[in-house]
Amino acid sequence: MNDAHKKILLKTARDTVTAVIKGTPALKPPQSNDPELTAHCGCFVTLKNGVHLRGCIGQFVADRPLIEMVIEMAKASATGDPRFFDEPITAGELDELDIEISVLSPLKRTDNPLSLRLGIDGIYIKKGRAGGCFLPQVATETGWTKEEFLSYCCSHKAGLRPDAWKDAKTEVYLFTAEVFGAAFKDIT
């Protein structure tokens, strides 16, 4: 994805977050025939205020073009992350936000979870109806080892025992992400 594509997606995410927080009319996706913007791939949109997470929502599987997925995930990240229902993003906070978009590769199941590459691979761990994920950048931001990355995903995201990733009945998937972002106020 080139810089022009990233700029379009970041502007679309910023404009969407602004509209949903200020209660103005929803955006229509920019018209594009560009294969990078119309590809069906999963994505996450992350909003931070300084080092503080303010929302992070995404989908692994896309049922619509990427540009539309970014709009939906930006809306959900701004208003639908249950971790922040008690402290929603305010209009006065918008210029302090940073937006990060992670465009995902398809999930690939692995029988060897320790084959993951820290800082390159994200993980999705599923057992029964429980599941949780970490984006690739979480390993870099936390400095965790592979075992810690897998264990924290099990215990803090999926609600499983920390060592559930070692169980043959637990499904572990790897994915990569193209990650880019910008300060809210710097996006033009």
Residue ranges and their predicted role:
Residues 1-188:
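Basic nucleic-acid-binding interfaces
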